[in-house]
Amino acid sequence: MDFTTMTMASNMATSTTTTATSAHASINSSSNFNIDIDSNQNTPSILINNNSDSSNGKNTDFNGVNNIHQKNIMNNTNNVHLYSPNIMDQTLLTPQDIAKLRRESIAHSQGMGGVSWGSISVGSWLRDEIISRRNSIVPASANGAASAAASATTTATNTLQIQQPTKRPSVSNPPYHRGYSISPQIAYTAYLPNLEKQYCKDYSCCGLSLPGLHDLLRHYEEAHISTSPNTTNMSQIPMNSAGNTSSSVRMTNNTSSANYNLQNNMAANTKNAGHKTNTMQAHSSNATNNTSINNMHANLQSNMDSNSTIRQSQHPHHQQNIIQQQLQSNSVNHTSGAVPTPSVMGSATASSTTANPNVISITGAPNSGLSMANHSQQLHLNGNLVDAVSTNDVFLRTSNSPSRHVPHNKQINSNNNSGININNNTSHNSNINMGSKNAMVNRPHTFNNYSLNKTSRNPIQHQSRKIDPHQTDLSPLVLVQDIDLSFMDDDILGPSNHNSMNSVVNPTTGSHNYNTFHSSVHAKSSQNMVEDQDIDDIDDDDDVDDDDDDDDDDDTENGSSSNGKSVHNNNYKMPQQAYIDDPARRLYVMDHEEQKPFKCPVIGCEKTYKNQNGLKYHRLHGHQNQKLHENPDGTFSVIDPDSTDSFGDGMGSAKDKPYRCEVCGKRYKNLNGLKYHRGHSTH
């Protein structure tokens, strides 16, 4: 029994020895590598960081291998630092890597902050891409040292296995770009331009093809800015222009059938006792009783080619602002018709002259009884009581065509359907004399020439007012509280060769004396239509735009009389105000001003546009929440709501847009706009 036990123990020892012999023999030396020798195949392999043997697929665990690796590599300075997380924590973490962990702050400091897609910021993304492409090439020294170490310790059949970290870059893990990278090797310096060129292009909006981001921004500002519901859109006003040549001015009110009295008008529209009210009165040479024209409206029934027609219209948004007028002696019955326009405002009196009882003229009436709904406010400007004009009322009408001349002794017949009741006894056909050849409709001469108020060279001659709310070939002498805005379209179309007509304005009383607004009533006579066609042919030769630059032909007037009245003259030049400090930079601005020749004529507004449509849109919506003051010389200034003082040239934009580009002088409301301008401009 003892013999049997000894035999079994001997067999177990033999099997144990055999197992140990067939197993892998581990050789641990003071070198940098651990070599496992396979007893079956005699194929040594270098194992780093406890990897499995690739030649035979058997796993071998050695206790303390990582510690031996770390100790040997740290002691030998000639060894190549192969990737191991424990080693990298101590040797390859540089201050630049630590700073990269704070890449959001770095990106903001370099001006790339604020732009992101989701949780990925543009600054960190671009910085990572640039650094990765710059360090995408593996250093040649690392490859050479690793191959030399491998060849010194292994044979031709040996394999070298290198383990790379499998975690994302962090404090404990070095970033990828410090070693091997699979990023494409392209020029990282051209990355930003290529990115902008690839993505910031080919926009499409409203059926328009917008090639660049600037074009998209301009289109958005011109077409997609929300406007006030009180804004008049002139394109929505219909106009009858086919065949019907009988033009009539009807006294109607489409919104109410009740008669308006003077007391209701004063109670609804007068805010304080100091506010002045205006009236429109019609006088006849045969009677002394004054009758008022109730809610004038012009049926737009003449051809587009007719050069002289009294036209008035109103957008539905302005129905609440209908001009209400009271009969002073006799009542006028209300008839159905179109909605009257609020543009016929201010002090206007239709009277007939002694020379010709059929001549219709509109003159100033300082003491009037017509009240307007929310159209005039009075402010104390520099100690004087002046009228403030809302911009919504100023930029209402427009026209593109040059004015027309009417020859001497031209008379147009009008039938009973004309609807102009100058007196209750007037029901017969009337001949309306259109005045002499000296009574011409004035057109402002140049761009910054704001001759709004005009008087005739011959004050005895009285002409009637012409109003055209559409983009027709008629002269736009549109008045909003006695303010003519046709100068804006004249600046666009260029100067014309008409005689100047001046007006006298008293800023202390707010009264305006209009003696020369020339117009005609188009009749249905075919003979008159032929004559109008002849007039159009004559005027086409006269209304030729000058080739000179509008900015070089700006006129100004500095003289004033002792009683506070200022007379505007077209023979003076207004200097162009420079808004940049450096004269050298001003040359740059002058060179680029040709690209945007259309400038807003309001003093204190620096808006310029490349085309006419941009200025038209700005006229309607650019000064929505501002008040404009009419200066004695006929210009407009933006009123400061805080101090009720008018802004000087450039002062309004400096307050609303405090951030200014020092090179070109452009101003922006916030700093982001200025940053975008600096990043995308050529200067």
Swiss-Prot record:
How this chain assembles, per its entry, is: Interacts with the target of rapamycin complex 1 (TORC1) in a rapamycin-dependent manner. Interacts with MRS6.
Spell out the SUPFAM superfamilies in the cross-references: beta-beta-alpha zinc fingers (SSF57667)
Localization (cell): Cytoplasm; Nucleus
Question: What processes in GO biological process is this protein linked to?
Answer: positive regulation of ribosomal protein gene transcription by RNA polymerase II; positive regulation of transcription by RNA polymerase II; regulation of cell size
The organism is Saccharomyces cerevisiae (strain ATCC 204508 / S288c) (Baker's yeast)
Gene name of the record: SFP1
What does the record's free text say on domains? The prion domain (PrD) is a Gln/Asn (Q/N)-rich domain, which is unstructured in its native, soluble form, and which forms a parallel in-register beta-sheet in its amyloid form.
Name the segments for region: Prion domain (PrD).
Answer: 230-458
Which residues belong to zinc fingers classed as C2H2-type? 598-623, 659-683
The molecular function terms in GO held by this entry are: DNA binding; DNA-binding transcription factor activity, RNA polymerase II-specific; zinc ion binding
Q: What is the protein's name according to its record?
A: Transcription factor SFP1
Entries under InterPro entries matching the protein: ZnF-Chromatin_assoc, Znf_C2H2_sf, Znf_C2H2_type
Which stretches does the entry tag as region Disordered?
156-178, 305-324, 332-357, 399-420, 498-517, 535-573
